[in-house]
UniProtKB/Swiss-Prot annotation:
Keywords: Cytoplasm, Isomerase, Manganese, Metal-binding
The protein, known as: Phosphopentomutase
Enzyme Commission number, as recorded: 5.4.2.7
Required cofactor names: Mn(2+)
Gene: deoB
Gene3D superfamilies: Alkaline Phosphatase, subunit A (3.40.720.10), Phosphopentomutase (3.30.70.1250)
GO CC annotations on file: cytosol
SUPFAM superfamilies, per database record: Alkaline phosphatase-like, DeoB insert domain-like
Protein's pathway: Carbohydrate degradation; 2-deoxy-D-ribose 1-phosphate degradation; D-glyceraldehyde 3-phosphate and acetaldehyde from 2-deoxy-alpha-D-ribose 1-phosphate: step 1/2
HAMAP family xrefs: Phosphopentomut
Residues at which Mn(2+) 2 binds: D298, H303, H351
Amino acid sequence: MSKFNRIHLVVLDSVGIGAAPDADKFFNAGVADTDSDTLGHISETAGLSVPNMVKIGLGNISRPIPLKTVPTEDNPTGYVTKLEEVSLGKDTMTGHWEIMGLNITEPFDTFWNGFPEEILTKIEEFSGRKIIREANKPYSGTAVIDDFGPRQMETGELIVYTSADPVLQIAAHEDIIPVEELYKICEYARSITLERPALLGRIIARPYVGEPGNFTRTANRHDYAVSPFQDTVLNKLADAGVPTYAVGKINDIFNGSGITNDMGHNKSNSHGIDTLIKTLQLPEFTKGFSFTNLVDFDANFGHRRDPEGYRDCLHEFDNRLPEIIANMKEDDLLLITADHGNDPTYAGTDHTREYIPLLAYSASFTGNGLIPQGHFADISATVAENFGVDAAMIGESFLGHLK
């Protein structure tokens, strides 16, 4: 019998809690990640007030220097620790795949200076359309169509861009490049990015409509992902008949593998929290696992190096945490964590190699305290043990520490 009938894992995308031991091997604009500290530097430079996470024990997580504006809690309502990544990457897919039990020894490729000419030329030859070279770099999805949409409407050229993650994105105005044509181009791009030196996690079709100055991305987005190279705990749960619910980009990250119920993409963190709450309220969701990603921390504030915006985003989540808890049952378990860091005060604009926090809460807890410090995959090992399925490649369960 399961200790918890339902477990809800919420990933606060990029909310790291201090440089990992191997941060010297990862870089931002030529600077090693050794001094990165997402939560620490936000609390230091912008101030941070997250009383609901403090109650669970956020401020009690072991750190060389305590979080400046996040106090410790003498009698927390939950259990906390920090977890280290073992995989050779600091991107979204690597972090999430490891959380679900995989050790990624061959990281995906990222293209901070844009894609090489060889890839662009192949896409041009296949599509019969030119590519706007100035867009070929890490770019905000809304900014790139604002900047190059008018030109695309005049010339029919493709807008090809990337991000901090191993993705190739193609934006196309639906009146200029029909959606079906865009999909065919993306399918081709997927076929040429399945191995080094261009091993990409996802190709994303990004259709949009509107006029210059008023472009809007449509619901016709389509992701061409790769499935995890081995079964994750999601697969093991699904195979055992345990329902799995994906909120936000979780379904895309795992290419639908092991997901029995996709609750859709998030328009914002707040929308994602709304979707999570609706998921918690589903009458048929009496047992199982929900997995939510809230990406605004990373996409809107981490990469843009905006510590004040990042702080406000954390405040927004913390303010809504009681709503999430209010919709949980007594024998539910809530796990709050991250997938990598993205220190908004650091050099460059890339993710940072950091520990991630882990907060565990259940109304059924009679104890509290620290969970032994471990690794990302300990989360999935704990979920697996709770539901009586095998763990994946790696991970040590901390289920026995939750009392």
